[in-house]
Amino acid sequence: MLFILSIVILVFTLWAIFYFQLSRNSGAMTLIAVSIVSAFISPWSLILGIPLIVLSIIVMVDALRMKIITQPAYKALSQAMPSMSSTEREALDAGTSWWEKELFMGAPNWDTFEQYPYPTLSVEEQSFLDNEVEQLCNMLDEWEIHHKHKDLSPETWQFIKTHGFLGLIIPKEYGGKAFSSFAQSRIMSKIASRSLTAAVSCMVPNSLGPGELLLHYGTDEQKKRYLPGLTKGEEIPCFGLTSPEAGSDAGAIPDTGVVCYGQFEGQHVLGLKMNFSKRWITLAPIATVIGLAFKLYDPEGLLGDKTKTDYGITCALLPANHAGVKVGPRHHPGSPFMNGTVEGQDVFIPLDWIIGGVENAGKGWRMLMECLAVGRGISLPALSTAAGEMTYLNVGAFARIRQQFKLSVGKFEGVQEVTSDIASETYMLEAFRYLVTCGLNQGGKPAVMTAMAKYYATESMRRVVNHGMDVVGGRAIQLGPRNFLALTYQAIPVSITVEGANILSRSLMIFGQGSMRCHPYLYEELQLLQAPDKDAALTQFNELFYHHLGYTFNRTARAFAFGWFGGSSDAPQQADEFSRPYYKTINHFSAAFALTADMCLGLLAGDIKRKEMLSGRLADIHAQLFIATAILKYYAHGQKTADEQLHAQLALDKALFNAQEAFFGLFNNFPMQLAAGVVKLICFPWGRALQPPSDQLKRDVAMSMMQDNAFRQQLKQHVFYNTDPDDVFGRMESTFQSLTEIEPLWDRFKKAEAKGSFDGLSFVEHIADALNTGAIQPEEASQLLSYNAQRFDSILTDIFDMQLEQTLPLDNPHLIEPLGVDTEAHPPAASAEPKTGGTAQLATDHHKEDPEPFIRF
């Protein structure tokens, strides 16, 4: 018994040293002292005590530590790490980090999190949304754009140019708007809610392109030359990166620029002879200025460095009408935004056309990655959020309006399973947008966060829109100007593919970049492992390596405590009874992730980049933790209504459950099962801590989605909202609002109708009978007839001529004049004889005290 007590004391001491992060010497001396004391309790404890004493001495004595631990570790890790190409290095090095680093490191600082300023719109930004963006949306008809004009109208293009839609990111000194990241996101979302084609056309110049590159890297002369024109729309930009041989592997572009002398504007100057063939370039067919990525070579050393011939990827800016440049023809990417080719053979340009001048030769890939790190966090997530919001509004309305088997389709549990998913995913998308743009508004280029935003937002959009198609069925399949969902569905592949293909982003980039940017020691360790001066590197590595070990053991201690005894109760001060349990789970999972990530990095080393499924699961864990914190912050700044809490609860339950499942998927598939089993035992000793969201929660959220709830009201502020019954969106929305107003009357009438309470075969005959028997009043009959006609119109799909070129008029047999009451043939309801046979007696007796006199049994 004393032996067990002494062992427990030693283990607890070891845990406390790491949990409370004692210094190396303090921890070692404490461990030696406790080992000696434990030996007095039970001499058998020296079985563990002696190794701990020896290890403590090694840790305290630098020479011993270097000889016994550091040198062997340095040698083994140097051999295990594969060589890294300059392109890989630049991609992984690019950008900065933000809140995602706190979550990666396993000890999120909630005070820091709470102090992040929540994004809001300035007066100017709000005015632009309410006026210019609203006007633009009124000009757009996505069906006409898709199937007739194959482009925005000339009037629309002119409006976009005149009102500065192409210069949202450009500083005011050049005539731009200088809007915040949050404002850009809101603007793009609102445009996308009306037309994805218009949104993409406005998005690209404000994302990765000449404007962004010039802002950050251009010379003063280049900025003065191009930025005012880009702002006014006098210049239309595009950027050529991808080519037939290089899509996701854009670093392998075959396009070249060779340093040589040539003729330019009548002078013999040093420049570049360029050969390029670019594909899938948005806005290329109408561009006036082209950004190009190419590989720069200097075989003759004309730039001054005779030893350097291969400079790597470089970016330059060319006028589209420059000699030898061929722009066009168009591609057809499933949506009619301008997209095409850019080609050139033996095109000579002066060196000062390199973005940033010759000093930036070879720095193009890092420039692109850093600009992409910002743009991909705004543009495609904004489009995804808009798609989610419009699907929520339209499908929620449809699910309430559309009846099958005499019941609104949204009340069937099978439908509720997917509509609840639409609701929670839309809530997540909006929350995600707020936190990501909050980070971007802080400055910096958080590459990992924006890679998460692009991947998880577009994947969420894919699920939401697919669910919407399932619910709406034939109404969403039949194309035409009435279809509110199909064109969004067609655009999914574009969002999934561009600005970082989703498979690549999840399986390689998110955790690959995350480990470089978010781990406190890994990046510096890798630099030292690959340093040419091994002796100098070893000295630095010795200190850094022990900091890393201390970090790992601290996270192990935290993960153990949280896994066995529950997560830390640390949370922001604004946390309430609803949110505190979620913060506790995040604390637990964050510590578990830090330990799991170190296990993968330490044991797999360079093989981690080939274990893409494991890397994808690590990305899932990291991202779902970030998403959960985004939802919590969004909820904290929201109205906290019962409906909003339902949305937040389902979104949080899904995010954290998905993170947990990624943990267990990784443990089950890790190649070294013993190590995975130990980490699993430390982090999840009781098995899965979370259950999937309950069916009842899904039902509640699905029912809320069919109501005009507070979250739905908020979404209306973020999209182009209208109730025009002849509009593709307004048709469903106006019908939904009409049903909201008369639903008690409608439901009572339909229930009575289902029980055979009325004579006649049609709805109109039932109305006439109910009216003439006094079961309903003339005003109610008018309301029922009007809504029924509106309801029928809302579910109609378009019809076309045989060539599918022109839509044809639709017949709505329910559009009739309200029926009158034959008072002579049918006496008032109070004296009407009730129908027999167990059916409901329908009468409205205004003289009896009955709050619900419409149906009596």
Where are these regions (language model features)?
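Amphipathic, small/basic residue-rich leader segments at the start of a protein or domain
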Residues: L10-I17, G27-V37, L48-P205, E212, ...
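Flexible, small-/acidic-enriched active-site or ligand-binding loops
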Residues: A323-F348
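A glycine-rich, basic-preceded beta-loop-alpha segment at the flavin cofactor/substrate interface
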Residues: T341-R376, L393-G410, Y434, R555-R580, ...
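Loop-to-helix element that buttresses phosphate recognition and phosphoryl-transfer chemistry
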Residues: G414-N441, N466-M469, A623-Y634
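Charged, glycine-rich active-site and insertion segments that engage polyanionic ligands
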Residues: G444-A476, Q645-A659
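A glycine-biased, small/acidic residue-tolerant capping/turn segment at secondary-structure junctions
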Residues: V465-Y489, L666-G677
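C-terminal amphipathic alpha-helical interaction region
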Residues: F560-P572, E577-D845, E849-F857
